[in-house]
Amino acid sequence: MTGIKRPMSQYQDDNEWEDWGPSKSQLKRDAEALQKMGEEIVSLSHSELEKIPLDEELAEAVELGRKLKPKKDESFRRHLQFIGRLMRSRDVEPIVEALSIIKNRHSTVNARLHRLEQWRERLINEGDSALNELMSQFHELDRQKLRQLIRTANKERELNKPPVAYREMYQYLRGEIEDLL
């Protein structure tokens, strides 16, 4: 099969290559990204879903997707494609921002809980020095209660008893200073 050959100079002079827009592969990647975003939205809890700015049609599609949930079902896959198609005709930037806020909130909560666990370990292992440092940062804590929990947790550890005071200390710290971390 022979085609019409044009001299290379014609391609260099014309700007026809620039007017073509995104490639077919790029359009497919964009569609798959929107479909994955739709899957993330469908998997959110109801309270998180309320924070996502969805118009009525997209919200109905997401609710239906939540009902179709079985991931091995072909209808669920097709419905995710439908959600992606709906999102292609909308400004998805507010949706992306809301999703990132939700994701960051989860990581922030995990970091706070991890810091509480570190404080608990330091209190049990270092004793009064860690307690004094904690009290200097958080004045509202009950020093006597913390000392009692530290002593009890150390005794439980020595006697190989269940870590009741260990857990109680974590709950106390979480209740008193979680919002301040």
From Swiss-Prot:
Its main location: cytoplasm. Pfam families: DarP. GO terms for cellular component: cytosol. It is found in: Cytoplasm. InterPro entries: DarP, DarP_sf. Keywords: Cytoplasm, Ribosome biogenesis, RNA-binding, rRNA-binding. Residues 1-24 are annotated as: Disordered. GO terms for biological process: assembly of large subunit precursor of preribosome. The keyword Transferase does not apply. One of its GO terms (molecular function) is rRNA binding. Member of a network of 50S ribosomal subunit biogenesis factors which assembles along the 30S-50S interface, preventing incorrect 23S rRNA structures from forming. Promotes peptidyl transferase center (PTC) maturation. Belongs to the DarP family. This is Dual-action ribosomal maturation protein DarP.
